[in-house]
Amino acid sequence: MKKIVLITGAAGFIGSNLAKNILQKDSVVQVIGIDNLNDYYDVSLKEYRLKELNCWDHFSFYKGNIADRSFLEQIFREWEPEIVVNLSLIHI
């Protein structure tokens, strides 16, 4: 059974590199990435990073905002992650 890791901010610099590192080292880990792809940083750069991550069959991406409770609950119900790494930037 695969261990499931959820990474928020997965399209950002740190989140994408963390996901890539996990994916390269361990094929028994399913990485779930969440990002809202906002334009605070260059969106095309975020899309490029996700394109690289999507090369692994044990990576799944969801576009959405972690402030949306129903969205987040759906992800948790579907995947039941064992580890959550929150690297999202929330604007106040």
What are these regions (language model features)?
Residues 1-90:
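N-terminal Rossmann-like NAD(P)+-binding domain of SDR-like oxidoreductases, especially those catalyzing
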